[in-house]
C-alpha cells in the first residue's frame, strides 16, 4: 500500500542522513 512505500522511502532517507553524519 501507499504507507509501505512511504515507510520504505523513510528508511532510505534515514540511511542517507546517517551516512552523512
Swiss-Prot record:
Antimicrobial peptide with activity against Gram-negative and Gram-positive bacteria (MIC=13 uM against E.coli, MIC=25 uM against S.aureus) and fungi (MIC=25 uM against C.albicans). Also shows hemolytic activity (HC(50)=50 uM). In vitro, shows moderate inhibitory activity against HIV. GO terms for cellular component: extracellular region. Keywords: Amidation, Amphibian defense peptide, Antibiotic, Antimicrobial, Antiviral protein, Cytolysis, Fungicide, Hemolysis, Secreted. The modification Leucine amide is found at residue 21. It is found in: Secreted. The keyword Secreted applies. Belongs to the frog skin active peptide (FSAP) family. Brevinin subfamily. The keyword Transport does not apply. Transmembrane segments: none annotated. This is Brevinin-2-related peptide. Expressed by the skin glands. Signal peptide: none annotated. GO terms for biological process: defense response to bacterium; defense response to fungus; killing of cells of another organism; regulation of defense response to virus.
